[in-house]
Amino acid sequence: MQQSKAVRITGTAMLALTVLFCVLPFLSMLSAALQPQGSMPEGIQFTTHPHWENFIDAWNMANITPLLLNSCILVIVVVPCVVIFCSLGGYAFAQLKVPCKGLIYVLFLVGLTIPFETLVTPLYYEISGMGLLNTRLALILPLIGLNIPFGIVWMRSCFEQMPRDLIEAASIDGAGHLRTFRSIQLPLALPAISALGILTFLATWN
């Protein structure tokens, strides 16, 4: 059913207002950032001689380089670890006969319900006892552990939806669990793995 002209105009106007509402704060910040240091424009005013060096000064004063490096290192280590562990774990929960599988999975579900604030103090004492305070491992290990419960649940639901015919055909051809996982399950699960990687990246970077 085609929309009427009035509906299209109203929808376009609402979208335009939404875009304007989202863009204006960024324009205001950019306008203020390009002014001479110590001055503040009234509203959104772009000077004829923008001071682009303000960004360099702010970068150096805030010492952004080591902070950015730390974030990159965390992401490079945490995201692959979470994706690998959760892919293997999700496959095991969905396809393999593991003793006490249901109980272990419930524990992962419980891990999703625990507020992070309740873990800060125990994590501090645990990291301190391991002698890892003021090291990158003090961030990497908790971030991996905190992202695994969600990743396990996410990947398990993905592998449970895999076509059983393909798995049975691979088994008839003599493929073991590892080959079935690597050659059949993993390629089919790439969309879910990509989504998990993006979500883990955002959680780690933030």
Model-identified regions with their sequence ranges:
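A structural signal for multi-pass alpha-helical bundles of membrane permease subunits
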Residues: 2-206
